[in-house]
C-alpha cells in the first residue's frame, strides 16, 4: 500500500512538473511572438546583404527578441502573482484553476531571474560583439572567425567584470570569507553582481519615473484630441493650407542644383503637412471625444500619480515605525493563504494598475532624458545595434520594476526567488532614502510641470526670457519664422 502511495505521489509530481513547464512555455511563446512583431516594426529594413551579414543580423534579431520577451515577462511577474493570490483566495477549491498554484508562481519568478541574468550577461553582449565582429586578422573570413572573436571578447569582458566585482566586494567587506568567495562563483559573485545591477536599475527608475510621471500629461495630450476652446479650426486649416501651397510653389520653382534649399523646404513642407493632418483630425473628432475623453484622461493620470505619491508617503511612515515594512523583512503568509491588500480584490487591481502605470512612465521618462534621447527607436529606421541597446535598457528597467514596487510600498507582495535576496533591500537607510528621494523628486517634477505656464509669464514680465532659459527655448523655436516668411503661431 505504501509503495502504491509513493508511486502515486511521484506520478502526481511528474504531472505537476509537466503542466508547469507547458504553461511557462506557452506564456513565453506568446511573449516571444509579440516581441518579434514589435522589433520588426522598428527594425530598419536591410538592403541586399551578403549571406554572412544576413545570418549575423538574424541571430542578433532572435537574441534581441528573446531579451525583450524576458523583459515583458519580468514586467508581468508581479501583477500576475498579485492577481493569482486573489484568485486562489476567492476560489480555493475550483477544479479549473488547479493549475494555478504557488509552485507555478515560484517557478516563474525563478525563470525570470535566470533568464534575466542570461540575457544581461551572455546573450546581449554576444549579440553586440557578434554584430560588430569581423574576425581576427590572418584568419579566413566567415561565421566561424566572427564567432571566435566574439567568444574571446566575451571572455575578456567576463574577466574584467568579475575582477571589478571582486575588488568591490573586498573593499566593502574585509572578512577573509569574502576573499575566499572568489572560488565560489555561482553562490556569491553572480548573485552579488545581479544585486548591483538591480540597484543600478532601481536608481535608473528613480531618475526616469518622476520625469515620466510629469511627461505623461504631455504625451497623452499629443495622442488625444484637445478641446477646441476659443479656437477656430477652419481658419487655422485655411492658413496652414496657404502655407503648404506656398511651399509647394517654391519647391517647383527651385532648380535641382540648389540641393540644400530643396532639402530644407521639403522638411518644412513635411512639418506643415503633419500639422495640417493633426488639425483635420481635431476637426473630424466628435464632441464627446474633444470635450470628455481628454479631460477624463488628464484627471485619471492626476489621480494615479497622486495615489502613487500618497502610497510612498505612507510607506515612509511605516518604515519608521514597523520593521516588517522593509522589502527584505519577514516572509508573508504565502500564496493563496491571505490577501496582501487592505481592500481585497479592488486593492489588488489598483496595485496592478499602478505598477503598469509606473512602468510606462519609467519608459517615457527614459526616452525623455537628454542622455538617452538618441536611443529612441524609429519605425522601420532603427539599426540592429540600437535595438540591442534598447533591449538591454528595457531589461534593466523591467527587472528592477518588482523591486522598486515593493521598496516604495506600492504592493505588499513579497519578492520571490533571487529578487528578494538582494542585500541592499535589508539596509534601512538605503530603502528610506530611496522612498524620500522618489517622493521629493516626483513632487518637484509635477510642480514644475503644472507651474510652467505661470513661470514663463513671470520670466517674460521680468525680462528673463531673453536669457534663453530651457522653458523659453522651445517657445522661441516654435515661434521662429518659417521658410516662406510666415510666422508659425499655430
From Swiss-Prot:
Residues in a coiled coil are 250-287
Q: Which residues form the signal peptide?
A: none
Ranges in the topological domain labelled Extracellular: 1-19, 84-110, 173-187, 313-339, 405-426
Q: Which residues lie on this side of the membrane: Cytoplasmic?
A: 41-62, 132-151, 209-291, 361-383, 448-490
Q: Which domain of life is it from?
A: Eukaryota
- Keyword Transmembrane helix assigned: yes
Bilayer topology term? Multi-pass membrane protein
Key word Membrane present: yes
Q: Which residues cross the membrane?
A: 20-40, 63-83, 111-131, 152-172, 188-208, 292-312, 340-360, 384-404, 427-447
* Tissue distribution: Widely expressed with strongest expression in heart and pancreas.
UniProt main location, coarse:
membrane
Can you say what this protein is called? Limb region 1 protein homolog
Source organism (scientific name): Homo sapiens (Human)
- Taxonomic classification: Eukaryota, Metazoa, Chordata, Craniata, Vertebrata
Amino acid at each position: 500500500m505504501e509503495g502504491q502511495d509513493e508511486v502515486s505521489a511521484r506520478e502526481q509530481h511528474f504531472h505537476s512538473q509537466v503542466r508547469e513547464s507547458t504553461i511557462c512555455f506557452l506564456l513565453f511563446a506568446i511573449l516571444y511572438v509579440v516581441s518579434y512583431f514589435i522589433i520588426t516594426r522598428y527594425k530598419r529594413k536591410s538592403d541586399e546583404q551578403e549571406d554572412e551579414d544576413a545570418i549575423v543580423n538574424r541571430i542578433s534579431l532572435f537574441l534581441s527578441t528573446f531579451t525583450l520577451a524576458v523583459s515583458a515577462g519580468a514586467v508581468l511577474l508581479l501583477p500576475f502573482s498579485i492577481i493569482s493570490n486573489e484568485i486562489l483566495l476567492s476560489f480555493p477549491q475550483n477544479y479549473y484553476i488547479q493549475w494555478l498554484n504557488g509552485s507555478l508562481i515560484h517557478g516563474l519568478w525563478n525563470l525570470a531571474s535566470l533568464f534575466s541574468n542570461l540575457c544581461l550577461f551572455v546573450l546581449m553582449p554576444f549579440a553586440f560583439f557578434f554584430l560588430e565582429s569581423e574576425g581576427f586578422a590572418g584568419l579566413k573570413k566567415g561565421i566561424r572567425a566572427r564567432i571566435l572573436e566574439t567568444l574571446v571578447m566575451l571572455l575578456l569582458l567576463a574577466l574584467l567584470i568579475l575582477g571589478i566585482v571582486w575588488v568591490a566586494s573586498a573593499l566593502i567587506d574585509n572578512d577573509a570569507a569574502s576573499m575566499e568567495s572568489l572560488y565560489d562563483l555561482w553562490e556569491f559573485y553572480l548573485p552579488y553582481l545581479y544585486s548591483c545591477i538591480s540597484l543600478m536599475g532601481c536608481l535608473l527608475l528613480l531618475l526616469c519615473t518622476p520625469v515620466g510621471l510629469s511627461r505623461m500629461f504631455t504625451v497623452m495630450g499629443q495622442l488625444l484630441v484637445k478641446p477646441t476652446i476659443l479656437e477656430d479650426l477652419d481658419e487655422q486649416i485655411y492658413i496652414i493650407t496657404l502655407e503648404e501651397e506656398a511651399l509647394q510653389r517654391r519647391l517647383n520653382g527651385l532648380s535641382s542644383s540648389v540641393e540644400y534649399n530643396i532639402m530644407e523646404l521639403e522638411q518644412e513642407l513635411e512639418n506643415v503637412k503633419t500639422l495640417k493632418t493633426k488639425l483635420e483630425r481635431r476637426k473630424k473628432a466628435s464632441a464627446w471625444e474633444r470635450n470628455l475623453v481628454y479631460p477624463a484622461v488628464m484627471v485619471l493620470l492626476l489621480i494615479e500619480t497622486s495615489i502613487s505619491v500618497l502610497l510612498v508617503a505612507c510607506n515612509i511612515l511605516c518604515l519608521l515605525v514597523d520593521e516588517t515594512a522593509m522589502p527584505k523583512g519577514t516572509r508573508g503568509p504565502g500564496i493563496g493563504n491571505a490577501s496582501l491588500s487592505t481592500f481585497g480584490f479592488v486593492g489588488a487591481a489598483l496595485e496592478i494598475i499602478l505598477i503598469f502605470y509606473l512602468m510606462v512612465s519609467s519608459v517615457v521618462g527614459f526616452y525623455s532624458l537628454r542622455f538617452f534621447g538618441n536611443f529612441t527607436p524609429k519605425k522601420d529606421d532603427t539599426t540592429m545595434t540600437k535595438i540591442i541597446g534598447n533591449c538591454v535598457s528595457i531589461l534593466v528597467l523591467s527587472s528592477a520594476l518588482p523591486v522598486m514596487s515593493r521598496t516604495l510600498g506600492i504592493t505588499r507582495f513579497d519578492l520571490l526567488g533571487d529578487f528578494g535576496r538582494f542585500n541592499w533591500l535589508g539596509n534601512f537607510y538605503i530603502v528610506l532614502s530611496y522612498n524620500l528621494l522618489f517622493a521629493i523628486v516626483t513632487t518637484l517634477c509635477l510642480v514644475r510641470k503644472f507651474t510652467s505656464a505661470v513661470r514663463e509669464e513671470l520670466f517674460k514680465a521680468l525680462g528673463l526670457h531673453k536669457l534663453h532659459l530651457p522653458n523659453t527655448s522651445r517657445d522661441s523655436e516654435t515661434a521662429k519664422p518659417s521658410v516662406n516668411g510666415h510666422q508659425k503661431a499655430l
